[in-house]
């Protein structure tokens, strides 16, 4: 019974707040114009197998998951760390399985 009263009180509060002047008087046209003027904030992503050492969170997304910036030391005596965007194997297998299931069911 107490849960019902809490939910009802919450709904009444939300409805009264949404109908009040607290939200503002933005009309649909004004809101659409604001959205049209909004600039894209996302910077260009780093493609798979390209260097991501400048920004380790800039890797692009695959069809389902975001690639991960993986750093390693290459063989050959050079102690310089190399970072590239790569897809983890478990995510690669999950994408392949999902694609096969989609192909089976249409």
UniProtKB/Swiss-Prot annotation:
GO terms for cellular component: extracellular region. Keywords: Disulfide bond, Knottin, Secreted, Signal, Toxin. It is found in: Secreted. Disulfide bonds join 45-60, 52-69, 59-85, 71-83. Transmembrane segments: none annotated. GO terms for molecular function: toxin activity. Expressed by the venom gland. Residues 21-41 form a propeptide. InterPro entries: Spider_toxin_CSTX_knottin (IPR019553), Spider_toxin_CSTX_Knottin_CS (IPR011142). Its main location: secreted. Residues 1-20 form the signal peptide. The presence of a 'disulfide through disulfide knot' structurally defines this protein as a knottin. Belongs to the neurotoxin 19 (CSTX) family. 02 (D7) subfamily. This is Toxin-like structure LSTX-D4. The lineage of its organism: Eukaryota, Metazoa, Ecdysozoa, Arthropoda, Chelicerata.
